[in-house]
Amino acid sequence: RKHILIYNFKVYLVMVFCVAVVTIFSKLLGSANSVVGVTVLLAVLVLRQADFGIKTSHGLLSIMGIYAILIAGPRLSNMVPPFAAFLINIVCIMLLMIMGCHNVIMYNHSTFVLGYLLLQGYDVTGQDYVLRVIGLLCGMVICMIIFYKNQKNRPYRRTFQDLFYEFNINSARNRWYIKLTFIVSSAMLVMNLLNMPRAMWIGIACMSVCLPFSKDIEGRAGKRGAFNIVGCLIFSIMYIVLPKSMYPYIGMIGGIGVGYSAGYSWQTVFNTFGALSIAAELFGLKYAVLLRIGVNVVGAAYTLLCDRLIDKIYAACTGRKVETA
């Protein structure tokens, strides 16, 4: 019972901290920039423990590079036609992968690429963008301080430049970079060409399914599709049953659920709450749910298909057998 109480305390403590950080950013930068708080929060939580596989002092350069992309990339991609945005996404996501994801087991892509997609999906202009830049710069400084404090004794000898010098298409790690970059960018391109809203949803779905090891992708794709449907059904029931005054708290309920979820499946279920609570207000419940289910099912299937196709193309061009484990 004592361990359960401690666990519950930790979950709620983290939740309170997360809500406080996002609220502070929203108050200072405006509600349109609450996503900045989410992006910085995710980075802080990761950089407390994760590293980049290079010297700590050079890791600070990676953080600066990552935040430079988060500041410029999403805004630029929203200013140009779909094909130009596709090229910008290719460059930005690839750089995020190279600078932030060398240590594959840290799963840093689920933080930095996710932040990029969120900032792109919740775009702002004018004074709001100026405030966004200020917020991200402050977040960068906070992340650098926390990262250096926690990681300064790491024994790595690899440098920031080595992340680029060591790039090799025959490396399984670098092929994963290419796969994820192409799959996410091309999926969003199709959404933009079809003039469908929430292109970031399919980008996030593809990113989540495109794991470093191909053998893991099929299982992840099935869970992504199936448990998004479960999440949408639960959300729909809550949205219909609860009074409108409770709608703003559905996302928070999802956050608590994620905190209690030990596995990917139920994390996927509860992650739908926050996304749909916003989309349902914009598009209506029916369209938002159908869009969410369709985008995630198609995105998961598309990622699985592209992963196998890219491996076959690589094997045919190089004569090398692709390792799946």
Task: Cite the ranges covered by each PLM segment.
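Alpha-helical transmembrane segments and their membrane-interface boundaries
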Residues: 1-110, 114-233, 237-253, 257-270, ...
